[in-house]
Amino acid sequence: MASSAFAFPSYIITKGASTDSFKSTSLSSSRSLVTDFHLLFSRPISSGPKYQSAKSAKPESPVAINCLTDAKQVCAVGRRKSMMMGLLMSGLIVSQANLPTAFASTPVFREYIDTFDGYSFKYPQNWIQVRGAGADIFFRDPVVLDENLSVEFSSPSSSNYTSLEDLGSPEEVGKRVLRQYLTEFMSTRLGVKRQANILSTSSRVADDGKLYYQVEVNIKSYANNNELAVMPQDRVARLEWNRRYLAVLGVENDRLYSIRLQTPEKVFLEEEKDLRRVMDSFRVEKI
């Protein structure tokens, strides 16, 4: 979907392997061992003859000897079962303690390639595509609804870009991107204020030999808790949201391409490495 240069979409879309089977199997096995353990010790054990003095003691009968032998065997088997149960339970505790680490695997990325319009990028595997969102392509996190990614490009009929340098330096482009963001997020509600800052602007030559600009912006939205109050002290501004916006721009096919990522500031701090990988993967291709 084509649009004019820097005509970013004027929308904001706000926005687990189970271990139950493992636990139930392990606990079931543990219960089975405990049951066997109690069954072994619940068997009746015949007692031997009462203690007698050395003079009056009589030779033990074969029956008494067999009873003592059975008791010793039962105790030995019981001890082995007890040791096995202890080892099993300790292993279960250790394995359960390591479950978060085992399932905290490296995020998997998919690659989106648009050979018709000439661009590609990687995105988290669990993100879903949203159609009809206004951009050429739009993905969002299914859990964190404020976290999304979109791509737009200018129409070749209304623009003729040969290089990013036609737009100026990264700093100049950053100011234009910031103004575009503020225009999009302008609110007509009373008592609403947007506070925006450019965090960084940079340029890089990627492995495809092409130049890319990157702009990072932080925007906070404040709203009064009582916007109709007469006295200023009754209108207390509260933070509605705090988001990080990243944009990467490239030029190819006489078009200006841009990929934009929006995420809550708190989420960005937790997922910064993965989100930067997404932005660094953006490429424009000759068509």
Swiss-Prot record:
Subunit structure of this chain's protein: Partially associated with photosystem I (PSI) complex, but is not a subunit of the complex. Interacts with PsaA and PsaB, but not with PasF.
Organism (species): Arabidopsis thaliana
Matching Gene3D superfamilies: Mog1/PsbP, alpha/beta/alpha sandwich
UniProt cross-references to InterPro entries, sorted A to Z: Mog1/PsbP_a/b/a-sand, PsbP_C
Molecular-function annotations in GO: calcium ion binding
Family as reported in the entry's similarity comment: Belongs to the PsbP family.
UniProt GO cellular component terms: chloroplast; chloroplast stroma; chloroplast thylakoid lumen; chloroplast thylakoid membrane; extrinsic component of membrane; photosystem II oxygen evolving complex; thylakoid; thylakoid lumen
Plastid listed as a keyword: yes
Subcellular location: Plastid, Chloroplast thylakoid lumen
Residues passing through the membrane, by range: none
GO BP, sorted A to Z: photosystem I assembly
Gene: PPD1
Protein name: PsbP domain-containing protein 1, chloroplastic
Reported consequences of knocking out the gene: Seedling lethal.
Keywords: Chloroplast, Plastid, Thylakoid, Transit peptide
Role according to the record: Photosystem I assembly factor that assists the proper folding and integration of PsaB and PsaA into the thylakoid membrane.
Cross-referenced PANTHER family: PSBP DOMAIN-CONTAINING PROTEIN 1, CHLOROPLASTIC, PTHR31407
Keyword Nuclease: no
